[in-house]
Amino acid sequence: MLMWPQPHLPTHPHLPTHPHLPTHPHLPTHPHLPTHPHLPTHPMMSKETRQSKLAEAKEQLTDHHPQTNPSVGTAASDTKKKKINNGTSPETTTSGGCHSPEDEQKASHQHQEALRRELEAQVHTIRILTCQKTELQMALYYSQHAVKQLEGEARDLISRLHDSWKFAGELEQALSAVTTQKKKADRYIEELTKERDALSLELYRNTITDEELKEKNAKLQEKLQLVESEKSEIQLNVKELKRKLERAKLLLPQQQLQAEADHLGKELQSVSAKLQAQVEENELWNRLNQQQEEKMWRQEEKIQEWEEKIQEQEEKIREQEEKIREQEEKMRRQEEMMWEKEEKMRRQEEMMWEKEEKIRELEEKMHEQEKIREQEEKRQEEEKIREQEKRQEQEAKMWRQEEKIREQEEKIREQEKKMWRQEEKIHEQEKIREEEKRQEQEEMWRQEEKIREQEEIWRQKEKMHEQEEKIRKQEEKVWRQEEKMHDQEEKIREQEEKVWRQEEKIREQEKKREQEEKMWRQEEKIREQEEKIREQEEMWREEEKMHEQEKIWEEEKRQEQEDKMWRQEEKIREQEEKVWRQEEKIREQEEKRQEQEEKMWKQEEKIREQEEKIREQEEKIREQEEKIREQEEMMQEQEEKMGEQEEKMQEQEKMRRQEEKIREQEEKIREQKEKIREQEEKIWEQEEKIREQEEMMQEQEEKMGEQEEKIWEQEEKMQEQEEKMRRQEEKIREQEKKIREQEEKIREQEEMMQEQEEKMGEQEEKMQEQEEKMRRQEEKIREQEKKIREQEEKIREQEEMMQEQEEKMWEQEEKMCEQEEKMQEQEEKMRRQEEKMWEQEVRLRQQEEKMQEH
């Protein structure tokens, strides 16, 4: 049987101790045995695993002996030499072949020193291992704690990301609603422009008809003037005829008077017929003028209604623009909230980076410790081989040195008591630390996996944040410019309203028109810039969406997302082309509007000129009507006189002397009657024409009456407006100064906008470069993911190896327990041998005493 010294083995409870031999009260039970109070048995481990772990622990403890105890080898060599020289076994007791007591004491003393050194080396290794365990447990604990914090922060970040996604979706819905409203407004404006075009055509036709009617009225006025001149001549002729009649009554006889009276009567009849025809023509023309005036009034009413509708629509559009501005303000506030959230996220990211750096340091320490362990394992394997050789030599020496060790054990036991007390405390601390380290190690491995994933995500986020900061700076500049442009647009709209009210005087001022044209051009440029900015914002938002989707689906669907990205880029390009086409259409529509407005201005000027001419015609017509009434009164007086003359002529016809003349006159009268009938037929035709003209004139007179009423109202309004215009002129002069200042500012802004456009072009190029970089980064990320997966597989393999090692440790522990039991049995045998040795010594002493007596 091979014997191995175990100074820390307990005594057997059932074996009686020798009366002369000291017991081992200071030796506690082995810490790896199941009876140890501080090391509970693992519930999931079998006996084989415990035995294997105990065996491995013993091997690790014994591996340090050859390095730390060089004296052991020397002692073994000395004993070999003694064995060779003596050539006898230790059990012989003859005087010639046995060793001297001094040599035996020296050998036992050397053997005890070697054992002490071995014990010290074992204690030292145990302390080193306990320190390493405590360090590992602390590192695991800190890493697990950091991982828990990182998980909580990651959850917070995920919840915030979900909130931001929801918020972005709401913003997109609001933007889509705004765009739909804008589209509806644009359609409504297009319909209004079409209606304006139709009205402008109607106005143009009406102006043409008005011009024709004016020409006809001018011709009629000329005819009326001729008729009036003829009437005046006829009246003069009538007066002269009356005078002649009066003279003829005095001078000429009755027959001559009758002939002249007949002649005058015929002339009067012809003149009266002409006057009636002219009166009927005048009535017809008056009716036509009335009808035309009525049409003009109706058209003006329609125009006013359309203008009211247009104003209402403009008010609606303004309300919509105000709503859009409110929505934009809300969007800005929400973006500010997002900025604040992102700043918080950045701070948290910085904290995470600091924690990650600490974890990396811990990982480096762990790697160093693993290297040290590997080196120690190699050394242990080499030392095991050496120790096996030395054990065989030491076992032979142990038989000889057991007698001498007993005397020295008493001194060692006192020291061992102190050592065991310290070791018990150390074991208790080690158990606590080991449990903590195990938990920390498990958490450390989990954290490392998560941290590596997060590192890649954070790197991508940092780049995205840098890009977002640049974009936001640009957006802030654009928003400031838009605010300035909105302020300018409001001022311009106020000026436009005043200009629309001041149409009569602003038309005379050509400079203001030039200013308006400049403002319109500037507005077009501003709108184009706004549209470009909105397109860019949409592009950025779409890119942000794409980045968020890439972050979420990076591990599972990156290839699908890349395909979608390409498709979306093609769609965006198509949308940009559509937007450019829409912009061109809008520009063409605006040019058409400007042309239509110029036509409207011209038509309104013509209408006003026509109104002035109509007023002059109305005044002339009134004067003519008064003259006609006077003529009618004169004609009535003449008819009464002619009636009296006819009565006198009838009395004269009775005169026989006048019968022949009367017959001749009758023949003439018949001829005249035929002529008169022909004239009457012509007159009837003229009367029908005149009636038609009178109906037209009546309609025109009705229109003119309505127009006069409106004109009176308009004149009153115009007087009020003139007062307002005077006040407004002063304001306009002040505004002109402001406008000039604004024009200078706008020119500066245009220059700034051109610079910005150049910068935007550069930024677009940079964005393209960044997209290429992002693609490269994605490829790198994929490679990194592959590496991470490989590392994860390695880690899993290492974990499996660790589990296998733990099982082996348990098996070694069980083996150690079995070996300890065997050692106890060996100790019992050693004690029995010691008792026999004591008996032999007693016998030897008795023999020596007898020898001395002899």
UniProtKB/Swiss-Prot annotation:
Listed Basic residues bias regions: 15-35
Q: Which UniProt keywords apply?
A: Coiled coil
Record-linked InterPro entries = GOLGA6L
Instruction: Give positions of region: Disordered.
Output: 1-114, 320-348, 366-447, 481-568, 581-681, 714-854
This protein's superkingdom? Answer: Eukaryota
Chain intervals with Basic and acidic residues compositional bias: 45-66, 100-114
Give the compositionally biased regions (Polar residues): 67-77, 85-97
Annotated coiled-coil positions are: 103-854
Q: Which family does it belong to?
A: Belongs to the GOLGA6 family.
Protein name, per record: Golgin subfamily A member 6-like protein 22
- Organism, by scientific name, is Homo sapiens (Human)
